[in-house]
Structures are given as structure tokens and as C-alpha cells.
Amino acid sequence: MVVNTIYIARHGYRSNWLPEGPYPDPLTGIDSDVPLAEHGVQQAKELAHYLLSLDNQPEAAFASPFYRCLETVQPIAKLLEIPVYLERGIGEWYRPDRKPVIPVPAGYEILSKFFPGVISQEWDSTLTPNEKGETEQEMYMRFKKFWPLFIERVEKEYPNVECILLVTHAASKIALGMSLLGYDNPRMSLNENGDKIRSGSCSLDKYEILKKSYDTIDETDDQTSFTYIPFSDRKWVLTMNGNTEFLSSGEEMNWNFDCVAEAGSDADIKKRQMTKKTSSPIPEADDQTEVETVYISVDIPSGNYKERTEIAKSAILQYSGLETDAPLFRIGNRLYEGSWERLVGTELAFPNAAHVHKKTAGLLSPTEENETTNAGQSKGSSTANDPNIQIQEEDVGLPDSTNTSRDHTGDKEEVQSEKIYRIKERIVLSNVRPM
């Protein structure tokens, strides 16, 4: 097997980003090795739950040895029950002229005391950044050199691992992705629209191999025929860019190489504050439109009853006429007409909770959950809201999203029960034939 899926995440919201302290000293005693703010800790838990909800979950995590990255990966490791390895090769980028010093992260002996039972000692860093600092070009060359060496080691030492997670910093997250995609420098655009890799706090990128490194199953001997593809010949595609949809406060502290200041530094914070002061406030809308979120079950027809109908991740869902007896749906390039029916049985919608697809010994748990489609915001549809059904989050659970302030001053975790909605309506779709 080969590594065919790579997640790359930036650490959570740092304590020195708070508008008004407290600003705790680094526990490691290393300059700028600041811990996360309470808000950043909650972001890390939200990221952990999001990864838990995915079918394709990381089987191992590699983290920059700076404290904020380990705080970010800790709830992920506990929730997904995966090992965490220290990797200096994906560490922070510091310019040679940085003052007063260029931070060097702590090692396993110190960090294991702060994160007992989380960090594995069974890994030596693939590369070590120049402790005298790096120019932008030197930093980018570090990551171009890092990838083939790192992936070769992972596949050799952990041959059954196909999906991994890297937890790093803003500049490193961008440079890792751009070098993996084969770009010449980290400042280039991803497309003609000028899009770039986004790097908000606790944002998540996903890279997948364009061509699987295996061919077909040999039915004669019931074995899979593998064709190994060297790393230099593998083609990667970015399938998730700076995703923050799972964060209750959305994207925060995005950074890119057009910024002059070091990512997350005091200079970076001051520049953001000045920009915020000089920018014009966005006027509030005069009218407030009331909306109602409606959860319904949508049945999609299949041409073959023996096969499961699947929708491509990139497919666009459009709908109209939910207030009518025959609403129209467009899924990808197909058009459907719907008819309302009463749902037989029980389906539940969990608006904010993660759907659990936990792996045990490399396999998904036998519990399968019904797929529910949020058909949009509309009036006139019947939806039952049962306030008696609630769930209890565990220690690494999510906070109630309504209690999160963007100022994040004096943030404290406040775990709330969450409502679950019972779905009673369904729409059965039928293909609309072209005229």
C-alpha cells in the first residue's frame, strides 16, 4: 500500500492573538513557543470531531514540535486513537534576520511531559530546518526535499498506512501544499482566478493521489495486483482548501506570502489591528429576513436496484419550489421532479454533531448512519423538533456554537446539550426526461 491521502492542518488560535490577555509565558521556556488560547483549544476539538465524521480518516499524525501544534493534534489523537510523531521537517519558517532569536523547538523528553501518552518516540525527524534561519527560497527547497524522503519512510515503516495528517504552521502549510502539487514557489496561484491555499487557524487541506498506485484485482487468486509508482511520478490534487466549515467562528487569522510580517507574530497582529481600524465598517442590512431550517429526507432514483446511488463530491445541488407539490432538484447534470411523502421509520438530523465513523483496528465500526440531506431554508414544510432528545458531549466534545465570541477574551469551555431533529417528511425524486 502507499500513502494516497494527506491532510494538512494549521494549528489553532494562539494565546498571543487575544485582543486583551492574558498572555501566558511559553511553558517550554522557548521564545515564541506560545500555547493556544482557550478558543484555539476549542478549535482543535472541533477539528477532531470533523475528522472523526469523515469516512477517510488519518491513521497517523505528524506534528511540528512547537507547543501550539501539539495542543492542536492532542484531541485528534485521543478521539481517533492514532499515534502522533514529532517531525521537525514541517516546522515553522523563520527568516535569518529574525530578532531576538530563532526559536528551536523542544524535543521528545520535554514535550512528552506536557503531552503524556500522546507523542510516540518511534520516529526521528526527516529533516531539520536551518537553525540560523531560512530565506523564502531555502524554506521552499526544504519542503521539496522533504516530501520524497518523508513519504518513502512512512511507506517503509508503516506499510499499511494510506492516510496521514500533518499539523504545522501557516507558511509551512502553504509551502508543503504548493511543493506537493509541483509549483515552483509558494506565491503562485492555483488557477486563473488567482486562488491560493488558505491558512486560517485550524484550517484543513486535503491532497489525494490523482492516479491510484494499484491496478486491478486478480480474480483468479483473490489477490490485489499492485503497481508501485515512485513519488516523483505521483500526481496530487488539492481536494480541500483551507476548510473551516466545521469551526463555529469560521475562518480566522488567514495568512499568505503576500503578508510582510511573520505569520502570527506580534508584528502580524499589529498590522491586522491597524487594517481593521482604517477599514470602513460594513453597514448592517435594514431588513431582517426570517428563515426556517427544514430537514427532509431525499430519495434519489437508481437505474439498478442492486447498486447504491452515489453522488460525486463536486456535484452541485440546486432546488426550487419546496413550497409546491412537485419541487424540482438538480444534482450535477441531472434534473429530477420530487413528490412529497410521509417518512416511514425514523431518521434523525444532527445539525452540529459529528457523525461517528470510528476506525477500530483499521476498520470502520459496524454502525452505519442514515444519510440526511438538508434541503434548504424554506417555509411551509413540516418538521418535527423533539426537545426531549438530547446528546451529551464527552471531554473532547464541542462547545455550543452560540457561546463562542470572536474576541475570545476569557474563553471557557461550556459544554451544552444539543438538539436532535426527527425527520418526518421525505421527497421521492424521479428523473425528468428531456423534451
UniProtKB/Swiss-Prot annotation:
Region (Disordered) residue spans: 362-417
A Gene Ontology cellular-component term: transcription factor TFIIIC complex
Biased amino acid composition, Polar residues: 372-391
Predominant subcellular localization, coarse grouping: nucleus
Superkingdom of origin: Eukaryota
Single GO biological process annotation from the record: 5S class rRNA transcription by RNA polymerase III
One Pfam family here: TFIIIC_sub6
Entry's localization field: Nucleus
Stretches with biased composition (Basic and acidic residues): 405-417
SUPFAM superfamilies listed in its UniProt record: Phosphoglycerate mutase-like
Alphabetically ordered keywords of this record: DNA-binding, Nucleus, Phosphoprotein, Transcription, Transcription regulation
Residues found modified as Phosphoserine: 365
InterPro entries in the record: His_Pase_superF_clade-1, His_PPase_superfam, Phosphatase_SH3-domain, Tfc7/tau55, TFIIIC_triple_barrel
UniProt-listed PANTHER family: TRANSCRIPTION FACTOR TAU 55 KDA SUBUNIT, UBIQUITIN-ASSOCIATED AND SH3 DOMAIN-CONTAINING BA-RELATED
Functional description taken from the UniProt entry: TFIIIC mediates tRNA and 5S RNA gene activation by binding to intragenic promoter elements. Upstream of the transcription start site, TFIIIC assembles the initiation complex TFIIIB-TFIIIC-tDNA, which is sufficient for RNA polymerase III recruitment and function. Part of the tauA domain of TFIIIC that binds boxA DNA promoter sites of tRNA and similar genes.
General remark: Present with 2660 molecules/cell in log phase SD medium.
Summary of subunit composition and partner proteins: Component of the TFIIIC complex composed of TFC1, TFC3, TFC4, TFC6, TFC7 and TFC8. The subunits are organized in two globular domains, tauA and tauB, connected by a proteolysis-sensitive and flexible linker.
Record-given protein name: Transcription factor tau 55 kDa subunit
Taxonomic placement: Eukaryota, Fungi, Dikarya, Ascomycota, Saccharomycotina
